[in-house]
A protein has these predicted regions:
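Active-site-proximal, glycine-rich beta->alpha crossover segments in alpha/beta enzymes
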Residues: 22-121
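Short beta-strand segments at enzyme active-site cores
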Residues: 4-8, 71-74, 123-134, 164-170, ...
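Alpha-helix-loop-beta-strand connector modules within alpha/beta enzyme cores
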Residues: 30, 50-69, 142-165, 203-204, ...
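N-terminal glycine-rich cofactor-binding segment that shapes the pocket for flavin-like pterin cofactors
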Residues: 3-4, 9-53, 202-208, 212-220, ...
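Active-site-proximal loop/short-helix segments
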Residues: 10-21, 74-96, 125-148
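Catalytic-face loop-and-helix region of soluble metabolic enzyme cores
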Residues: 157-280
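Aromatic/hydrophobic pocket-lining residues that form the small-molecule binding cavity
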Residues: 51-54, 58, 108-111, 115, ...
């Protein structure tokens, strides 16, 4: 392996707002967020106290890792947290947010400041960077995502931890321009699309881009999986070493629960073998 990641469930911060989280087997809340949950001011001390297990886990992990292995942190994106907290995680698109004062207060006055504290805590406890996993931000209208939501994240999180945040959103509009990584002060982004990374990568000037093997391929029988893997490797083998610079080879999303372990191992071994040979 090359890097260890603190994979702490992204929904824990919602418990600080009064929701009770359970798993059956997926996440289930006893209720959803309401106005009363936003009225009580949550202090930095309370936020850090309720999430201090993350700092402890990071310190333990760092002490166990060899010095040549990296350690990165992990939080949920504010919109993704809110979509779960409102019980709206399965909706395709959510519109009219600029007219909904409750949603905007929850986002900008509560969740973003809360996540800023948690990110700082992780960075102060040996995380080299922190991934912001915001897959449900795809629910936002493109104009609102760029002009309102991302501007707020840029001003209140990305700029405060410049070069220390990696951002993931499914179908991320920022992937239209590789320069957005540096323009938003990010360390990198995850390429949450199935196609196009091999065209994006040669234009990358700063930071890293991660992806983008489709996770569902890992569920397939060996022969079908091998076809997909061959196609993936061929696409990136056509690029020069310089053009591949900044690429973190991975899936375009997380590993699915029923992924075949032999396919995961095969993916890692084939990718390393092929691209190590190309580097020689």
């Amino acid at each position: 392996y090359d890097v260890a990641i603190l994979f702490s469930d992204i929904l824990f911060p919602l418990e600080s707002l009064g929701l009770k989280l359970d798993y059956a087997p997926g996440p289930v809340f006893n209720r959803f967020l309401n106005e009363n949950d936003l009225s009580a001011q949550i202090s930095s001390t309370e936020i850090l106290e309720s999430n201090k297990f993350q700092a402890e886990a990071l310190n333990i992990t760092r002490n166990l890792l060899p010095s040549n292995k990296s350690l990165v942190g992990f939080v949920g994106g504010p919109w993704t947290l809110l979509s779960y907290g409102l019980g709206r995680k399965d909706e395709n698109k959510i519109t009219g947010i600029e007219k909904n004062s409750f949603i905007e207060r929850a986002l900008y006055d509560v969740l973003i400041p809360m996540l800023r504290e948690i990110i700082k805590m992780q960075l102060d406890n040996h995380s080299e960077i922190v991934y912001v996993f915001d897959t449900n931000a795809k629910q936002l209208e493109k104009d609102y995502f760029i002009q309102n939501y991302m501007e707020n994240l840029k001003n209140n999180i990305f700029s405060e931890f410049e070069g220390k945040i990696a951002y993931f959103c499914k179908d991320n509009p920022l992937l239209s321009n590789p320069d957005n990584i540096s323009d938003y002060g990010l360390s990198g982004m995850v390429f949450g699309k199935n196609d196009g990374l091999e065209k994006f990568l040669p234009n990358l000037n700063n930071g890293f881009i991660q992806g983008n093997f489709e996770p569902t391929h890992l569920l397939k029988p060996r022969d079908e999986f091998e076809i997909e893997l061959d196609h993936f490797i061929q696409n990136f083998s056509r690029l020069s070493t310089e053009e591949r610079s900044g690429w973190v080879c991975s899936l375009n999303h997380g590993v699915l629960p029923k992924a075949k372990e032999e396919n995961v191992k095969r993916f890692i071994n084939r990718v390393r073998t092929v691209f190590d040979q190309l580097e020689d």
